[in-house]
């Protein structure tokens, strides 16, 4: 009996890890990966950090260059897909080639959510999703240049830190009343706001751009009435999933390809993962997790589901952010206002804990990354704590 052919569409973390997971889980059939980028699949997190700060930055490949040939995975780089071929099971490229598939994994990521007012600036306005974006930003983030960043989420703050370290004059504009409002708890939001302000970043909350004039410098008029002059304008206000191919194939979409918890779409032969996917939970709600670890997890889940194997157990959600000399790691549930703090954030060493009825459900570490491993185990096991003991620095965490 002829083994099935699996095609992976995408060139990022989820795509590469799906290939690795399929081989690790025993798939020996024909395996192809199609990507519109000419690079081997590379890590995205360094784009806003080391790719802007190091003297001679290099893309960090998800898998070693020799892995692909050694594992008999056929790479098709720099190609554009015309149709997924849901009915014919034939992937069609814009160059006319067609490729048969029995199962398909879509991991084509997302684009920056557009902001037409700034997009009209053309090459003077920047977003950050790919290696080419980072290379262009690196060229323009020069000392003493005025940089305006729209959006104070994770990417916006990481870019603010990198631009400041490149000795730019940075202003951040945020519509909300706080920074990192979607994915950090209140005490961490306050810490980050103060950290950036101390570094010289001007952060304008509860504000937005109303009018833009392109001249020798870009003139930005804000809702508050203030006018800013900028040499460089960057924005990061969320993502827009690259779902067009899926829509054209009549797959369910909702700013993302709708999948179940096995990463399966409405077509049982088609799976999706990473930023392009959005999960319909058991209660009907739609949930997207935009993180490096989620891309890895969904790649492993999809591979297992494709092969009819038991699905791996998911660890608590985890992501990290590097800003200035700080490493922050977020794990578990970030909701809620009653967080405990172990240590003193002013010394740039602390851990915030989220206890619910004594059960640890979430935590954020500040330059204490070594503690993430035990914290992960505690969250997974539903361990209960005495709050006073948890924040007592005289008691080693590992002894609790």
From Swiss-Prot:
One family name in Pfam for this protein: Pyr_redox_2
Keyword NAD recorded: yes
GO annotation terms (biological process): 3-phenylpropionate catabolic process
Transmembrane residue ranges: none
Pathway: Aromatic compound metabolism; 3-phenylpropanoate degradation
Disulfide cysteine pairs (residue numbers): none
Top-level taxon: Bacteria
EC numbers on record: 1.18.1.3
Enzyme class (EC, first level): oxidoreductase
GO terms for MF: 3-phenylpropionate dioxygenase activity; ferredoxin-NAD+ reductase activity; oxidoreductase activity, acting on NAD(P)H
Keyword terms: Aromatic hydrocarbons catabolism, FAD, Flavoprotein, NAD, Oxidoreductase
Gene Ontology CC annotations of this record: cytoplasm
UniProt keyword Electron transport present: no
Catalyzed reactions: 2 reduced [2Fe-2S]-[ferredoxin] + NAD(+) + H(+) = 2 oxidized [2Fe-2S]-[ferredoxin] + NADH
Residues involved in NAD(+) binding: 146-174
Chain residues that bind FAD: 5-36
Cofactor: FAD
PANTHER family for this protein: APOPTOSIS-INDUCING FACTOR 1, RIESKE DOMAIN-CONTAINING PROTEIN-RELATED
Family listed: Belongs to the bacterial ring-hydroxylating dioxygenase ferredoxin reductase family.
Subunit structure: This dioxygenase system consists of four proteins: the two subunits of the hydroxylase component (HcaE and HcaF), a ferredoxin (HcaC) and a ferredoxin reductase (HcaD).
Functional note: Part of the multicomponent 3-phenylpropionate dioxygenase, that converts 3-phenylpropionic acid (PP) and cinnamic acid (CI) into 3-phenylpropionate-dihydrodiol (PP-dihydrodiol) and cinnamic acid-dihydrodiol (CI-dihydrodiol), respectively.
Name assigned to this protein: 3-phenylpropionate/cinnamic acid dioxygenase ferredoxin--NAD(+) reductase component
Organism of origin: Shigella sonnei (strain Ss046)
Gene name per UniProt: hcaD
């Amino acid at each position: 009996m002829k083994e099935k052919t699996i095609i992976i569409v995408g060139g990022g973390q989820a795509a590469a890890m799906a290939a690795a997971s399929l081989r690790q889980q025993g798939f020996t059939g024909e395996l192809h990966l199609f990507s519109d980028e000419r690079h081997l699949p590379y890590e995205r997190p360094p784009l806003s950090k080391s790719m802007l700060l190091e003297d001679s930055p290099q893309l960090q490949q998800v898998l070693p260059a020799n892995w692909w040939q050694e594992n008999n995975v056929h790479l098709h780089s720099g190609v554009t897909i015309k149709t997924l071929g849901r009915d014919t099971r034939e992937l069609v490229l814009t160059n006319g080639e067609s490729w048969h598939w029995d199962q398909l994994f879509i991991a084509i990521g997302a684009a920056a959510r557009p902001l037409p007012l700034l997009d009209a600036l053309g090459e003077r306005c920047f977003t950050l999703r790919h290696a080419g974006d980072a290379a262009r930003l690196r060229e323009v983030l020069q000392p003493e240049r005025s940089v305006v960043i729209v959006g104070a989420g994770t990417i916006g703050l990481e870019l603010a830190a990198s631009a400041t370290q490149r000795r730019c004059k940075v202003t951040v504009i945020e519509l909300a009343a706080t920074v990192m409002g979607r994915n950090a708890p209140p005490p961490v939001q306050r810490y980050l706001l103060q950290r950036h302000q101390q570094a010289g970043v001007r952060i304008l909350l509860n504000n937005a751009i109303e009018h833009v004039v392109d001249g020798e410098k870009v003139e930005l008029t804000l809702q508050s009435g203030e006018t800013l002059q900028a040499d460089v304008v960057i924005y990061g206000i969320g993502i827009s999933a690259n779902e067009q191919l899926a829509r054209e194939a009549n797959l369910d979409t909702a700013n993302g390809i709708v999948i179940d918890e096995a990463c399966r779409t409405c077509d049982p032969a088609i799976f999706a993962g990473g930023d392009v996917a959005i999960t319909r939970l058991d209660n009907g709600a739609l949930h997207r997790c935009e993180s490096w670890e989620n891309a890895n997890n969904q790649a492993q889940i999809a591979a297992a589901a494709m092969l009819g194997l038991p699905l791996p157990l998911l660890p608590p959600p985890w992501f990290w952010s590097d800003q200035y000399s700080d490493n922050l790691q977020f794990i578990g549930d970030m909701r809620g206002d009653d967080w405990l703090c172990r240590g003193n954030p002013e010394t740039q060493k602390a851990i915030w804990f989220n206890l619910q009825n004594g059960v640890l459900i979430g935590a954020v570490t500040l330059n204490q990354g070594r503690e993430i491993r035990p914290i992960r185990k505690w969250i997974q096991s539903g361990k209960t704590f005495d709050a006073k003991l948890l924040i007592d620095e005289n008691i080693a965490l590992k002894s609790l």
